[in-house]
Amino acid sequence: MLKTEKILHLKTQRGRSVRAVREHYLREDVRCGSALCHTCPRDGKLLSEELTHYVVPDCQVLQDYQEVLEFPELRGIIIMQTACQAVQHQRGRRQYKKLCSLLRDTRHDCILFSNEFQNHAYLPREMGESALAWQTRCIYNSCVWYYQHCQKKIPVVMVTEDESVIGKYNTETQEVYVVSFQIYLETFWPNFKGALELYKSLRDTHLERKLESRESNGKEYPEHLPLEILEAGIKSGRYKQGVLSVNKHRAQLESFVRLQGLGGKETDIQSDIFIHGTKPRNRAIHGDLVAVELLPKSEWKGRTGALCENETDEKVGDMQAEVMPTGRVVGIMQRNWRDYVVTFPAKEDTETQGKNTQKVLVMPWDYRIPKIRISTQQAEALQNYRVVVRIDSWESNSLYPNGHFVRALGRAGNLEAEIATILVENSISLNPFSEAQLAEMPSNTHENPWQVKPEEGDRLDLRETHLVFSIDPKGCEDVDDALSIRVLPSGDLELGVHIADVTHFVQHNTYTDIEARSRATTYYLADRRNDMLPLILSADLCSLLGAVDRYAVSVIWEMDCSTYEIRRVWYGRTIIRSSYKLSYEVAQQLLDGDLEPLSTEKELHPLKQDPARLQQLLWAVGKMTEVAHATRMRRNMSGALELEGVEVRVQLGEKHSIDDLVPKQPLQVHETIAECMILANHWVAKKIWESYPQHALLRLHPPPRQEFFQELKECAKARGFSIDTRSNKALADSLDQAHDPSDPLVNQLLRMMATQAMSNARYFSTGSYTEDEFYHYGLALEKYTHFTSPIRRYADIVVHRLLLAAVNKGPKDHLLGNKDLEELCRHINARNRAAQQCQKQSTELFQCMFFKDKDPDSDQRCISDAVIYGIRTNGVLLFIPRYGIKGAAYLKNTDGLVLACEEDGQCRWVHGSLQRLPAQIVVTTQEAKSFSFCLFDHVTVRIRIQSSRFHPDSIRLEIISNRPNPSQEALPSASNPQLLRTELVKEVTRTAVEAQLAVEGAAELKPVERYQEYRQTQGQSLYTMLEELWDLALLDVSGA
């Protein structure tokens, strides 16, 4: 090993140049990472032997065109340490982290070569030599060494944007080529148009940025403060740090900074900080981590209480326009830029945006994102397309951020393009499982059937001793869990929850494990799903299907036969053979004593001739329901919440047209299964925390902020109820008492509003929190985790590994420490939020599709009963039970007319005024006639669709009568208060809609079979979204 010195010229965060001297060690045994080399260690990522060449980007190409190199189709990429360090020092933490992630990702065929530690690859910097010239010379010398090290078996191509470098080095060494990046893409990847298009888009953006910096010095915004000044200000309490959240309904006017912790000094700021207008936002974009300076109290403002475009119930606490802490953004702590879907303006608008028609202001799909300026030659060709762009910069002299074109998704209005838009907007990128991942999968064919292995003999075998069965949605193929219950010789009960043993098939750090970790969850849309695991696992070998042997991880309790108090618990690996695969409907019929399924369900036909076996099954379902009820009552006594969510499924006709939107109906057996899953999750949480108190993965649900309950309290007060929100127990008791015998929907709406006020539940590592912070507010449990759905949640896979290590049935050397586990939890939480938002937006898409082809003036399906649940200064918020839709209706239109009601209840627009009161809004006409719209009033509405060229279509509601719709049938959940409690349990309902809208917007349907091939569940699936209450991921009501 040779010791030398390396002189670095660095810049501080304030821009000051610093000369630093570092010790530098050179070695002979630096790993090359090529599969062609048989002398270096072969651990870690290796470049394939099958490649035709290796490609090495120089520093400038890596910095400016890293996005192009991220395409997995580009293979054989060698990132030199010299170029990697240039990114770190010159492009900042964000791009460097992306580069490190790319190098770690086994799905991308790229490696890091530590050329500056290799004795013969490294060249010291010469006196007077510029940093860029030295970096280029060092990288080229490393390319030559690498080519010779691989015994000249494969050519090496160095790509650069510097023509002088090409002229100097291109002919210097045979089989080591130096070419421009564009020539490389055109020559070596002629059929990969996407990479070349992205390269040209980035190139044009860099040229435009250089021109703009020369042309204009005028400031549109103040400069951001340097990072070290911001950090000092946050520490002293002068500045506050938080995430910028833009109100999508008033994106130009209202945004809020949600504080991530108070400063070092005492402060009375305990709420969000209001940012009024775009100038004080100072180029911050929704999701950025920002530093904010509070304005003087005399300049504080309040958010408006009026309806505006796109008003829905996405927020809480908008009852009054009270003054709140107001500030301005002084700096960006961390950008949160992502891919954005945009649409080009109409042709006539494009031509008026400047002399250079290649520079276009495109409109983002997301209302919260400002217009983005891009340079492209495809503006006219992509007029009616949804396209993806990325933001590159936002200089202080520009009104809008600068970005570049990435790719087109398809025509706006086309179903597949709209679905792709939703995925991109939620940063979800799902490629088919790779050959490497599928190669890890076991086989289960007719010729080579899968069987229980002899080496698994230490598992507890339940196949002959236990009646095991599952209860799932009809047609479900991905069965995560099965149950058993029996009476022990001692007279006690034994209850078992058996969960698919996914970790047996998905070993740590395999290709499948890495892909599952990246996806973190299965993504559900209204008409399809994208799985976390390959189909052979999720729908076959990990699925606890009936009459086949399967591996499971089980939790088995021994409990008192009368009180159901738990005496002992056992955890471990098992082998099971499920006897019955029941649907929820069939299980509910059996629970109710209805034996019709014995004739209608083929699986149950043998029970007609076996009354003893039938009684055993009936007893098991009934006893399990009793145990679940007792367990639930104990949680209720501790303060468990019974809240409401809205779940709607798309009902298809024979030709796959959308025939109806149907709210999901709850069953008692839903709650039974959910409670058993909660019990298993709770006990597993206790076990893994006891074994690994510093790095167990648990799930917490923090108490909600009290100000979010304000609208709930006001609404309850309007009906004479008082809501106590001091604790979860007080809230639960208050909601139980808030029943209106004349209208059960009142209690349902109050519970839905309580749900809106809740905080988000999230995963965490126990070493990062104190024990009193572990509490799950919604479920009233001291410790909770997710164990029961490893097929569709990566968190459950981690918990399985922890549990098996804790009971000495699994390896311990791969368990994550607290820091790594906390980082993984942040990733999973982010992916879960994306999955929830994606599912919500896709359902809204199909709701709009359902109404879009209907005439709202003549089609009775567009006329519905609605309930007022919110009052605004110019309108009301409505809930439509028939379709599970929330929306807003104006009482004052753009012409200044107000909505007045005739004696027969019909409404019309007249001159007049509005007066907003806490529980009602009063309409007064010029003739001095007054009408009131009160909270919880039933009205009749007309449903229309508002189409948008740039944004998603949205539902618009018009009040046509201040009386209930006489033809509307009441929902069962509204007419039967006893069913309200089981609405806590939610299941995603999905269909196999195969629709593609034609170019001009007409529906063109495709066969469903193509997607059914990849689906796991035919029909409804419970455990996908049980902890989600529409937007908030609150309720972990099953262990799913």
From Swiss-Prot:
Matches recorded under PROSITE patterns: RIBONUCLEASE_II (PS01175)
A GO BP entry: mRNA catabolic process
Domain CSD2: 360-426
Gene3D superfamilies linked: 2.40.50.690, 2.40.50.700, 5'-nuclease (3.40.50.1010), Nucleic acid-binding proteins (2.40.50.140)
Record Pfam families: OB_Dis3 (PF17849), RNB (PF00773), Rrp44_CSD1 (PF17216)
Residue stretches making up the RNB domain: 459-808
Keyword Cytoplasm tagged: yes
SUPFAM superfamilies: Nucleic acid-binding proteins (SSF50249)
GO (cellular component) term, any one: cytoplasmic exosome (RNase complex)
Disulfide bridge positions per record: none
Catalytic activity as recorded in UniProt: Exonucleolytic cleavage in the 3'- to 5'-direction to yield nucleoside 5'-phosphates
Needed co-factor(s): Mg(2+)
Enzyme class label: hydrolase
Subcellular location: Cytoplasm
Keywords carried by this UniProt record: Cytoplasm, Exonuclease, Exosome, Hydrolase, Magnesium, Nuclease, RNA-binding
Annotated InterPro entries: Dis3_CSD2 (IPR041505), NA-bd_OB-fold (IPR012340), RNase_II/R (IPR001900), RNase_II/R_CS (IPR022966), RNR_Ribonuclease (IPR050180), Rrp44_CSD1 (IPR033771)
Subunit structure: Component of the RNA exosome complex.
Function: Catalytic component of the RNA exosome complex which has 3'->5' exoribonuclease activity and participates in a multitude of cellular RNA processing and degradation events.
Record's protein name: DIS3-like exonuclease 1
Naturally occurring in which organism (per UniProt): Xenopus laevis (African clawed frog)
